[in-house]
Amino acid sequence: MVLKVISANQAVAEAAKLAKPKVIPVYPITPQTSISEYLAKFVADGELKAEYIRVESEHSAMSACVGASGAGVRVFTATSSQGLALMHEIVYAAAGLRNPIVMANANRALSAPLSIWNDQQDSIAERDSGWMQIYVESGQEALDSVLLSYRVSEDRDVLLPSMVCLDGFILTHTVEPVDIPSQEDVDSFLPEFQPQVMLDPDEPMSLGTFTDPDYYMEARYEVEKAMERSRKIIERACREFSEMFGREYGLVEEYRCEDAEIILVAMGSVCSTLREVIDELRDKGKAVGLLKVRVHRPFPAEEIKSAVRNASKVAVLDKNITFSVGGALYTEISALLRDREVYGFIVGLGGRDITPAHIEEIVRRTENPERSVTWIGLKEESE
């Protein structure tokens, strides 16, 4: 294992290199671009033996991923924002075709107005596509999650694609120490992809054929069952990863939740700030905890209910908006926790900074609520 001070984008590229995909179709887009650049260099320098395809668009990138995966090889790609939106048609196809693709998404706001800065609207818009979704907090977690995603996606009981989501600029361009495991250890944890079904000219078959009402619903139900099965596969993979590499992950992560009266729920890099503020609030006598939702799909319903069982109030921070009802995570958690007070807070859209003062405001508004959903950090003239 080697310790390097690198960005989360480089951490993702290092993880992809360690996973040894055979095909990498990618189209660069800010703030994902350096992922594609690192991978291109790895291939050009002979460090990674893969077919690096310089496609003309993100739609083509995902189409090439589907074709390569259907032919039975491990594939990787990366995108962001408008690129993911352009992929939308094929994102759904990849899940329906049961292609175990792994894709990194550098979370960035969607136009309009045009923004290159961070929020999570792009990946949230794909939450119903049939892809597993992991939201990471650090460069280390980004690297580890790419490796874990291959292990889970390629399991014969799952065979669904995975999206590793990392906050644009906040993570993608920030450097920090990251442990890079040895190729030998990764090969032991992640063996070569063994496809169950693949396109083979010697044994012709069809993949992704037209279907009618007699079969379509059952096909979608198979995706649902695979998503449900993935929970235990994720937990098992995380246990084995911890035994080999010493870092623990799960569907969710609890921080000072056991005796918390108020629990803040969030995804991604903001969780680091939340921990710092929670420690300060604890010093002031406020019983506040954090529930980090690491895996958004499959949705960790039982883990969320268990984590908040002792809390009287729950505050959900969303870096996205489902217009007229609040953030996506808030709508799901409020539906899940009908027996307690759940409040939603829209934060950080388009890269708006989320400060410790904003988090303290969220706690105050949860203690003395005025409405179910509140936008935090707006300019005064907009309120």
UniProtKB/Swiss-Prot annotation:
One Pfam family from the record: PFOR_II
Keyword Amino-acid biosynthesis: no
Signal peptide region: none
Single Gene Ontology BP annotation: response to oxidative stress
Segments crossing the lipid bilayer: none
Reaction catalysis annotation: 2 oxidized [2Fe-2S]-[ferredoxin] + pyruvate + CoA = 2 reduced [2Fe-2S]-[ferredoxin] + acetyl-CoA + CO2 + H(+)
Principal EC category: oxidoreductase
Key words of the record: Oxidoreductase
Quaternary structure annotation from Swiss-Prot or TrEMBL: Heterotetramer of one alpha, one beta, one delta and one gamma chain.
Protein name as catalogued: Pyruvate synthase subunit PorA
